[in-house]
Amino acid sequence: MGKNREMRLTHICCCCLLYQLGFLSNGIVSELQFAPDREEWEVVFPALWRREPVDPAGGSGGSADPGWVRGVGGGGSARAQAAGSSREVRSVAPVPLEEPVEGRSESRLRPPPPSEGEEDEELESQELPRGSSGAAALSPGAPASWQPPPPPQPPPSPPPAQHAEPDGDEVLLRIPAFSRDLYLLLRRDGRFLAPRFAVEQRPNPGPGPTGAASAPQPPAPPDAGCFYTGAVLRHPGSLASFSTCGGGLMGFIQLNEDFIFIEPLNDTMAITGHPHRVYRQKRSMEEKVTEKSALHSHYCGIISDKGRPRSRKIAESGRGKRYSYKLPQEYNIETVVVADPAMVSYHGADAARRFILTILNMVFNLFQHKSLSVQVNLRVIKLILLHETPPELYIGHHGEKMLESFCKWQHEEFGKKNDIHLEMSTNWGEDMTSVDAAILITRKDFCVHKDEPCDTVGIAYLSGMCSEKRKCIIAEDNGLNLAFTIAHEMGHNMGINHDNDHPSCADGLHIMSGEWIKGQNLGDVSWSRCSKEDLERFLRSKASNCLLQTNPQSVNSVMVPSKLPGMTYTADEQCQILFGPLASFCQEMQHVICTGLWCKVEGEKECRTKLDPPMDGTDCDLGKWCKAGECTSRTSAPEHLAGEWSLWSPCSRTCSAGISSRERKCPGLDSEARDCNGPRKQYRICENPPCPAGLPGFRDWQCQAYSVRTSSPKHILQWQAVLDEEKPCALFCSPVGKEQPILLSEKVMDGTSCGYQGLDICANGRCQKVGCDGLLGSLAREDHCGVCNGNGKSCKIIKGDFNHTRGAGYVEVLVIPAGARRIKVVEEKPAHSYLALRDAGKQSINSDWKIEHSGAFNLAGTTVHYVRRGLWEKISAKGPTTAPLHLLVLLFQDQNYGLHYEYTIPSDPLPENQSSKAPEPLFMWTHTSWEDCDATCGGGERKTTVSCTKIMSKNISIVDNEKCKYLTKPEPQIRKCNEQPCQTRWMMTEWTPCSRTCGKGMQSRQVACTQQLSNGTLIRARERDCIGPKPASAQRCEGQDCMTVWEAGVWSECSVKCGKGIRHRTVRCTNPRKKCVLSTRPREAEDCEDYSKCYVWRMGDWSKCSITCGKGMQSRVIQCMHKITGRHGNECFSSEKPAAYRPCHLQPCNEKINVNTITSPRLAALTFKCLGDQWPVYCRVIREKNLCQDMRWYQRCCETCRDFYAQKLQQKS
């Protein structure tokens, strides 16, 4: 098995892609790319990620910060920037599979081996190393020279613990993994390590960095600075936990239903880089927990009290009991972790230490999940690495026996104030509490009740924590999944049962699920409601008292920064993270900055977006910032009481109708809607000015924005919206010109219309009914006349059919008059014809032989929706129209199956004595748009345009300012813009003419270093201020006048004789020196047309021979036809006309046939004219049954029977 896998790995490595991982100067990872559409990936992190001490001066120092992490604003951390040169990729030998350990017969089954096409890959990349200063920044384009790094030195002793500035403990990491960009905001977090944490090796191999920490006053945790915790930005509920100890990156990301793992490979040949393995496990709810799959004890062993087996199901009746006192908010589990000799030997002592601490950091974060409602902190006091198995400790296949032995051993070691107590009592005092939990990590494949290997990965005593001889856990090393195993087993040790034991929680996939422990069907990192109640039941019991007896010094003082990320990274810097260093925030979209971050890349005219809002804390207005996609005040709003509504949120759109919402906090533990006595969230319609003409529809805009998000840089794939009637509030998009709808998002943005017609609007992914009165949830509806709550009697319906079947070109169907509503034109069947529509102006659909794609068009004052799916078409418009519309059909030679149209027009006008009073319009001044910035750099201003608007019947339009002359016009709003400093650059004039008109000469130009002022004026600057070398001011040239001209030959005949083709000619330079001017070279080929030989003779098939025996004749049809149109003509050459007749020779006629026994074919042909078989289905059977002799059958199958007689004659002859 190992050899086969190794061969596959070697093959895969030869075709893998490897990309550069780099950093911006502010510590943000700018590029970390993976090969697309793979469940398992490999990436090589550059040498800049190696953890090397760096002093503030740039040389080697004593900082414990990993070299690849730079805290924003922190001191003492290295600055690293990606090298811009190309990289060489080569394959290397793969890491061999795990060897059997102590009689183990096969490799581990958890996690399962990768399937076909998902094998591990190992690559090594040559990186540009650091300069002499250790971790100095490498600028793009630096020389690709390097020296091998010096031999590894033992890390120096860490400095005393210091309180780092909050800004220096966070880093923003960008990972474009699995076809999407993930932005991780990580904070340094070593809270799981106690200040007196120590690592001990038994027996002690001697002094070294991992030797026993026996000093009476050990320093701060030596590994606390290389652990990071955080989440994925804009993904609430996500979790990220990583370690950078040792120079690599190890940990996991939980995002929705995916678990993404990153771990370094053991590649000692990688001198300048660290190969890493990146893979994911996706949650699958397809595996229902059946009776077979519910046997989770196969993977997890739970030992209850001695001699008393634990019940498989937990009674539900006692779970509703509430206790009168409130639980404390924080519990601490002071833990000792032991690694068995097989674990230490497999990884190596130093690597085992880093790996185990990484796992424990992940376990710490699993217990921090808010679903527990109680804070449970893992505090690691000591890590013991066993190089030899103690005589009194049993490590073997029998899991229950091993657990019992380990509990007894740890009690002897830590249960009596000898060892760890004696080391720490000097500083902690004699009242120090005992160890709360002990964990043994082993490489031994064990089984619960059998002395043989099996699939069990963890075993623990149920509710054994704090008990002297039952506070034990054993977990098998199965990679990064070990963190989930330890968290799961610690849950058992704190009295938490499997979710499968609770009928109400058996269907979920949480940490305590029986499926979860396998590591094959991970759910999420939350704890179920049943686990929460089991834990609360344990914490309320006296068995949990030790978790409250925590020494204050064991609480790590690392503080999580409270600063929002948008306060650290401006909008311009966030754009640089998304689109590169030449990007900046698009000032034109300042008014909608919180709904989506729009960026402009230098050199491009249009703004880009990825539809994601900016980071929380980004400035959006004076005294306001963005939070959760909304522009809110920086001053925190007072918390409202339970059940009290919050303020209405800003409108989801800036033009046209949108959605606004408000929420309220609900009483109860779960804050569910049922505790609110009504909905927890309410929505309402908010009106805005109409969107400017010419902009794409809101749904199309979302698709177009997504096209920038997913397209490759070389080929921008444009998308257009496709409406799915079953899921109107999901975003389906199709490439322009193709009918291939793809679901790009489960939810469209709030305020998107549910369809092309109607008022219904999408809110939170659901279509909300909107009445014609503009109220959400209203039952008011327009009648087909367009009257809200009307009776349908104010208009009449005009409908009809158009059945013009054949023709070519545009044919007018009808003219739809002005004032029409509810226009609908539908093809009866798919056809090759095209519907066309045109108003009195220049607006049209499918006119002038130009066929449009599906979309919305503005014609005659209304929005017309055109839909084409294959050959079927539909046109619809709500109206009313302000001008007549001409409906046409573009016909071809194919069949047109007709179309149906209908619309409504107002009924007869009111009598003269009646009048309909028109509603009075409302005029007001509004800020409609922003002017351009008055400076391109150096700081400028931009103002709003104040326009007079007319509001009438909920329609808003811009009118002449005279309408608002009696109103006070507000001052325009002013904002600063383009505050970036103006750059210096070289400016050159045009080259002067060559000094000689023929032959070699010189030409010159003026070169100066210039700088642009804020008003656009260019001034001369010092040459040393310009970047790059000074361009040349003189160059050699050669006069062109003495050069001879090109000589062109005669055009050849056209390449085709019927249609468009190409003709050629020869062009040569007559100058002996061959220095003719290429720009004046005549063309050698051009298009041509020749229709001289379009008519050709077309021949039909030869007919059958005129007789059945002897000599006869055959004929065929000869026609003169046009090659392209297929029309008949008389322009074919008669000399080239093929023959229409030819003789045919069959076998000689046999005159010996007895005419009394068989009907002669000639006689039959004379008496009956054969027009073909009348029963073609049965004629073959009649022939086989020899019924052709009967004249009755012959008449019905004369054609088949002729051949029958011919065979008979041939056989007898």
Swiss-Prot record:
Glycans are attached at N266, N803, N913, N955, N1015. Residues 120-139 have a biased composition (Low complexity). Keywords: Cleavage on pair of basic residues, Disease variant, Disulfide bond, Extracellular matrix, Glycoprotein, Hydrolase, Metal-binding, Metalloprotease, Protease, Repeat, Secreted, Signal, Zinc, Zymogen. Residues 640-692, 921-981, 982-1043, 1045-1089, 1093-1150 form the TSP type-1 domain. The precursor is cleaved by a furin endopeptidase. Disulfide bonds join C407-C472, C447-C454, C466-C546, C505-C530, C575-C599, C586-C607, C594-C626, C620-C631, C651-C686, C655-C691, C666-C676, C994-C1037, C998-C1042, C1009-C1026. Residues 552-639 form the Disintegrin domain. Its cofactor is Zn(2+). Residues 140-155 have a biased composition (Pro residues). Residues 52-71 have a biased composition (Gly residues). Expressed in fetal lung, but not in any adult tissues examined. Expression was detected in an osteosarcoma cDNA library. Residues 331-551 form the Peptidase M12B domain. It is an enzyme of class 3 (hydrolase). The keyword Protease applies. Residues 110-119 have a biased composition (Acidic residues). Residues 28-322 form a propeptide. This is A disintegrin and metalloproteinase with thrombospondin motifs 19. The gene is ADAMTS19.
